C-alpha cells in the first residue's frame, strides 16, 4: 500500500499542470506553441532539470577551452580599445531568447559538446574573460563600467548562478517571451547588487528561430504566427516598460533560417542534425519542398516586418526611462570569410548555432 501511494503521488506530481499555463488565451486559434501538455508539469520540469544537470557534468565546461578553430583570434595587449564612447551609464545587462542566446555549443568540437551552453561566450550577454579574447557586448561595456552586473560568467544552464540575468531557454519560442520577462524582472529586482530605480538596464531580446524552424509546419494556420508574435512582443515590452525603470531594449531580428540550414555541401554531421534542429525545412518528416520553404520564408519576412514596426511604434517612443531599438542582425549576415564562400569556423559543430568566433 505504501509503495502504491508513493507511485500515485509521483504520478500526480508529474501530471500537475504548469503554474503559468492558467491564463486564458484570446487568440482565435490555439496552435501548437500555445498548448501545454503533460511535459509542462512540475514533476517533468524537475526531471528535466536533473537530466540537464547530469549532462552538464558529463560534458564538462567546454567554454573554458583556449584553442580551436571555433575561437576568435586573441587581440594583442598592445592594441588599444577601438571605441571612444560613453557607455558607463549602463549598470545592468540582461537577455531573453533561445539557444542562440544561450550560446549552445559555442565551444563545441564534437556532438556531445552540443549539450553544453557556453553562456559566458554569448555575444549579447556573455562576460567570460575580456574583450580581447571574447568580444561580446558585456565585455565591451565592462571597459567603460567595470561594475556592470548581469552578464553570464561561464558555462551554465538557466538555473545555475553563472547564468546570471541570461534568461534564455533552449527550444524557446515567441510564446515564452512574456513569461521570461516576468522571471527576469523578478530576478533582477531581487539582486542586492542592483539599484532598482537608479540603475540603467540593457536588455536584449532575440527570439523566433524555433518558431520558423520547428513549429511553423505543424500549425493549422501558420500565417497567423506573425500576428501572434506581434501580440507577444507587445505584451512583453509593455510589461518591461511598466515594471522595470530605466530600461533600454535591443530587439534583435529573427535569425535567417535559410542562410544556415540551406547551405550547400554541408558536413554529414550538420546535414543529419539539421533534420532535428530545423525539421520544417530539412528532410521529409513534414513533406518539405521548395514550395513549403518559400511559404515559411514569407512568414519569416513577416516576423521581421512585425519586429521593426513594434520597435518603431509610438507607444515606445519619446519616453524618459524606456526605449526600444530594432537591431536587424540577420538581414545582411554572411558566412563568407577568409576567402571561403562558407567559413564553417563561424558555426558550431552542428552548423546551426554560432561558434565563439561567430558570436564575436
Spans of model-derived segments:
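Short, solvent-exposed loop/turn and secondary-structure capping segments
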Residues: 104-109, 177-178, 214-219, 261-264, ...
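N-terminal secretory targeting modules
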Residues: 2-96, 100-157, 196-199
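Histidine-centered active-site loop/cap adjacent to the catalytic His
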Residues: 343-360
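Structural recognition of the beta-strand scaffold that forms the well-ordered cores
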Residues: 92-104, 139, 163-168, 201-206, ...
Amino acid at each position: 500500500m505504501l509503495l502504491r501511494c508513493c507511485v500515485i503521488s509521483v504520478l500526480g506530481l508529474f501530471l500537475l499542470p504548469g503554474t503559468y499555463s492558467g491564463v486564458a488565451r484570446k487568440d482565435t486559434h490555439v496552435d501548437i506553441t500555445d498548448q501545454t501538455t503533460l511535459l509542462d508539469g512540475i514533476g517533468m520540469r524537475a526531471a528535466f532539470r536533473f537530466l540537464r544537470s547530469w549532462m552538464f557534468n558529463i560534458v564538462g565546461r567546454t567554454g573554458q577551452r583556449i584553442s580551436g578553430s571555433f575561437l576568435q583570434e586573441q587581440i594583442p595587449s598592445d592594441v588599444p580599445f577601438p571605441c571612444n564612447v560613453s557607455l558607463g551609464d549602463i549598470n545592468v545587462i540582461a537577455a531573453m531568447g533561445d539557444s542562440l542566446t544561450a550560446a549552445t555549443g559555442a565551444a563545441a568540437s564534437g556532438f556531445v559538446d552540443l549539450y553544453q551552453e557556453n553562456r559566458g561566450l554569448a555575444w549579447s550577454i556573455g562576460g567570460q574573460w575580456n574583450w580581447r579574447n571574447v568580444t561580446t557586448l558585456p565585455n565591451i561595456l565592462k571597459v567603460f563600467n567595470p561594475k556592470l552586473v548581469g552578464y553570464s560568467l561561464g558555462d551554465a544552464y538557466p538555473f545555475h548562478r553563472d547564468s546570471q540575468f541570461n534568461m534564455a531557454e533552449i527550444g524557446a519560442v515567441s510564446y515564452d517571451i512574456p513569461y521570461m520577462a516576468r522571471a527576469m524582472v523578478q530576478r533582477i529586482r531581487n539582486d542586492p547588487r542592483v539599484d532598482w530605480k537608479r540603475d540603467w538596464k540593457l536588455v536584449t531580446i532575440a527570439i523566433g528561430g524555433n518558431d520558423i524552424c520547428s513549429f511553423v509546419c505543424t500549425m493549422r494556420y501558420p500565417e497567423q504566427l506573425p500576428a501572434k508574435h506581434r501580440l507577444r512582443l507587445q505584451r512583453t515590452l509593455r510589461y518591461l516598460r511598466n515594471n522595470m525603470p530605466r530600461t533600454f531594449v535591443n530587439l534583435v531580428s529573427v535569425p535567417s533560417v535559410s542562410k544556415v540550414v540551406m547551405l550547400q555541401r554541408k558536413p554529414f554531421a550538420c546535414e543529419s542534425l539539421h533534420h532535428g534542429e530545423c525539421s520544417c525545412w530539412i528532410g521529409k518528416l513534414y513533406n518539405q519542398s521548395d514550395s513549403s520553404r518559400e511559404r515559411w520564408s514569407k512568414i519569416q519576412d513577416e516576423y521581421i516586418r512585425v519586429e521593426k514596426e513594434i520597435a518603431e511604434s509610438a507607444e515606445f517612443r519619446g519616453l524618459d526611462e524606456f526605449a526600444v531599438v530594432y537591431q536587424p542582425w540577420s538581414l545582411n549576415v554572411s558566412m563568407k570569410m577568409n576567402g571561403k564562400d562558407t567559413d564553417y569556423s563561424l558555426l558550431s559543430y552542428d552548423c546551426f548555432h554560432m561558434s565563439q568566433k561567430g558570436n564575436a
